[in-house]
């Protein structure tokens, strides 16, 4: 493409990507990677990939590693609910707000690889489910996607970000492993993540790929975890399940709030779905 070349401080060749309309990380570094040949979704440098982590794919995966990651996500999320019930509400709310945005993975619809976390009010609304629903209070959630069917404005992007945030420690190691395999340059970077053992947000300095313009760390995600829409989602629940199951006419858009309220009072319907 007639792109000029220049050198980074670590002497890795980096391509001037001004000629690329939507440069991926492989274009940026001039590394000939084919998406079909690598395990991870090759990220764009300046915008999100319009895909999302579907936790259900980890749950149903034949890989024990994927199953283990799903279990760790559910366990950590339910422990957050326990924290909320144990009079540590401020810490639980603060943590959920942090978990609700995982910009480093670059998944979603942002054209700047940067979204916004949920509000304090929305975080409290989610955590209140651990008080309001008896089954959740006693046993926790089996799938975090269930939250989409219970709280307004919580959808696939939030579910994906929460899952990625709770797996961020794994994704850091995974990214480093894949970068070393394909010769992708790494730079010293500070990155925060939720430590599930300490039950707190910690910061680590490690070597990761970065966007030099924004200095944002970049994390890779296994492509087998990604879908455009999660297996468990509101539209499927509304169109394919709830109307047929309770035999009642609903306008899913107009009455979405009423359906979410119905779900909170009939959580057994959600679990059956």
Predicted segments, located by residue:
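Long, contiguous, compositionally biased segments that the model treats as domain-scale units
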Residues: 7-185
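Short, glycine/acidic-rich hinge or "gate" loops at secondary-structure transitions
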Residues: 182-194
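The feature marks a conserved, polyanion-engaging helical scaffold used by nucleic-acid processing enzymes
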Residues: 191, 196-273
